[in-house]
Amino acid sequence: MNSNSTIGRTTLGESDTISLSFSEPSSSLNSRSTDVVFASTSTLVPQQGSLTSLPPVSSTATPTYYSTSLTYDETLHTSIDVSSTSTLVSSTDSSSSSEQDTYSSQYDPATSSYSIITPSMSIFSSTSPMSSSSSITSEWSSLTSTTPTLSSSATSLSSSWSSLSSPSSLLVSSSLSLSLSSSYSDTKLFSFDSRSSIFSPSTPTVISPSYTYLSSISATSFQITTTSELSSSWFSTISSPSTTSNKDTTFPSSSRNTSTSFYSSSLSSTNDFSTISKSSKLSPSASSSTVSISTISVPTSSSVSSSSSKVPSNRPSSSSSSDDTTSAYSSTYTFQSLQSTTSSSIPPTTQTPSTSTISTSPIPTSSQVFNTVAISSSEDSKTIYYFYTQTYDITDSSTTFVTGLPTTIAVAKSEVTSFSAPSSTITADMSFYQHWLDGSLDNNKNQGTSKTNTGTIVGSVVGSVGGILICVLVVWFMLVRKRKAKRHFKENDSFCHEIGRRTGFPTTAQAKEASLQAQDSGSQQRNTETASANNPFSNEFNFKARGNPPPVPPPRNVTAMNGSFQNMRSNFMDQENRFSYGSSFTYSSLGSSTQGGFSTLSSNSIRLGRGLDNDISHDERNTVQNNSQGFLREII
């Protein structure tokens, strides 16, 4: 005994929202102009004869009518927005005692939106001038009429004249009716096609293509009808009294002119816009098809009418003249818009769930041959995808079988015009088939590519770091080299080096050597002093080694001099010869030069000073170290 029971039923509710928005602003520009000119001349020429009869009358009437010039500019903007929203309808979960569960869900279609825009439109209508002329020349009343002309399409014109004459009065009335009618119609057709497909490369039965078709038809018709009516009446009375004398005859006359003008125009337009949308979805697994049709129809009707009337009156007389004009103008504008119902019918579709069954029974050894190959395709803007079943011969050590696996190939549109599936059988091992079942077949193909990408990334990082280090080393080497060159330039460009270079001795380098040798042992100092005895710049920076100037050599010519002159010589030589570059002129040479012996100058060489000459012992040099002065002080 099976008893069915419902576990739960939940109704989530249904929400259906339809929003319809219609906007149609219009702007019109009307320009009207009407000119009516009526000219009438009457000439009375009396003739001899019986006064009881009316004299001949010559009358000419020339009415001129200019029709209304209508300029109509209308801009219409139509915007339609239709949206619908649907939610989950119901959800039912039921089960029975036989361990069978059923779960079903039904959804309404998704939100849809339509937008329709009508472009602006302008209508220009103009009517050519129209004139009418009539001439009456008759004794009793003979009428001649000229039919007016109008340059317009679909135009009807009617004109009527009536005349009545009597011995004492003449009545002429005219009526003019003008009717204009023009129509304008426009039909537009919009068509949009789109196709989409949903497919899965792993399962060939889940290919569900859908087709959507959207077409829009817009029909617009306009009809413009204009009616103009002009009526005018002219009344003239001529009185002729009977007299038998030859006196002057007076003819009093009275005239009345009445004109009536009526103008009426109407404009009607009809706009019908409809949209038809078709959508179909095909599910090969369930062999079912669903078609939904949505229709939107929006007719619009509008009418414009205007009327104008003018009634002038003219009544001149013989004694006085007056002009009474009565005009009336009325304009009516009527606009009516009608919205039609919008119907949309989209039945819900239920997708059949796919079922997958895995059996643990051993694979049979029987072979199957797939002779028929079905090809399906899907395409986008640049690529075409072909789906077919490829035959594989799976071979293993214990079993061999033939199976068909779904295959997808992507081909560019510019490369191929037709495609045929290969009929050959591909041999593969059991691992290939196992990877296909697991869904990891594509991952194995991409392993080699991932390894190559990893090596490329590592190589790029190492190369970048090495290049940065090399650049840093090059910059550091250039900076150090530039700093050394600048320091060397400063040392060689000093003042002392310039003076030493003039005398043939580079003083800068030797001064450094002397300062270093002064810090060594006493034996090294003695060797340095002995080696540099001939170098006047050896003790350049040793200010203590400076001594008093060397003694004055004995005079060559011994002459008798008074004591005052001797004192002057000693004082002079002591003050002038205590520097290293003091003059070695002796008093005898100075005295001889003062006595006129210019050619008897001393032949001795310039003496450098005490402590630097070779003939001075080392002890004497040490005794005069405290009284020495430096070379830089001499320069200052």
UniProtKB/Swiss-Prot annotation:
Primary subcellular site in the record, as a coarse category: membrane
Glycosylated sites: N4, N257, N492, N557, N562, N626
Membrane topology note: Single-pass membrane protein
Keywords (A to Z) from UniProt: Glycoprotein, Isopeptide bond, Membrane, Phosphoprotein, Transmembrane, Transmembrane helix, Ubl conjugation, Vacuole
Composition skew (Low complexity), residue ranges: 19-33, 87-108
Protein's UniProt keywords contain Phosphoprotein: yes
Localization per Swiss-Prot or TrEMBL: Vacuole membrane
TM ranges: 457-477
Residue segments, region Disordered: 1-33, 87-109, 238-271, 299-326, 339-362, 510-551
Post-translational modification Phosphoserine, affected residues: S628
Covalent link Glycyl lysine isopeptide (Lys-Gly) (interchain with G-Cter in ubiquitin), residues: K512
Family, per entry: Belongs to the TDA7 family.
Protein name as annotated: Topoisomerase I damage affected protein 7
The species this protein was found in: Saccharomyces cerevisiae (strain YJM789) (Baker's yeast)
